[in-house]
Regions:
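Short, small/polar residue-rich loop motifs at catalytic or cofactor-binding pockets
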Residues: 69-75
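Signature of the catalytic double-stranded beta-helix
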Residues: 46, 50-52, 61
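Conserved "boundary/linchpin" sites in short secondary-structure elements
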Residues: 1-37, 52-58, 81-93, 102-143
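Surface-exposed patches in mature extracellular/periplasmic domains of secreted proteins
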Residues: 62-67, 120
Length: 143
């Protein structure tokens, strides 16, 4: 009986310790491209291909009405998994117009799956975070 009680106490201690861990602590290997330049050429090429896909396959009609409202250029970080699926879309700076922000989320998710990581990129990362400023004029441009 004592052995069972000791085992239950040890399991409870492990659960308590796990619940106190930083929730952002993760074993996922992340690459972050917060601008256009990075020492990792594979990461830059992947992010440029991702941006090109968004810009070339997106019609301005998706945001035309919302973009007529006064708004800021949103700064958005998109996390892409190694298989090309979208992990998250996070706004560093909102456009100030909920319809535009929601349209960006729809655009990002509607064009997934993105290209899977190259073998070189896969050796280093499980997830790549790409940050871009979205600008709407006669088209959608990612800077």
């Amino acid at each position: 009986m004592r052995a069972i009680g000791r085992q239950l106490n040890e399991e409870a201690d492990r659960r308590d310790a796990a619940s106190r861990k930083d929730p952002s602590a993760s074993t996922v290997r992340r690459g972050r491209l917060l601008g256009r330049a990075d020492a990792n050429a594979e990461l830059v090429l992947y992010a440029e291909a991702w941006s090109r896909k968004i810009q070339l396959n997106m019609t301005f009609d998706m945001v035309r009405e919302a973009a007529k409202q006064p708004h800021a250029d949103p700064l958005v970080t998109v996390a892409v998994r190694s298989d090309g699926s979208v992990e998250s879309v996070a706004f560093v700076r909102s456009s100030g117009v909920p319809a535009i922000d929601e349209a960006i989320r729809r655009i990002v998710h509607s064009q997934a799956n993105y290209q899977a990581f190259s073998p070189a990129l896969l050796r280093e990362y499980d997830v790549v975070e790409i940050r871009r400023t979205w600008h709407f004029d006669m088209a959608v441009r990612l800077y």
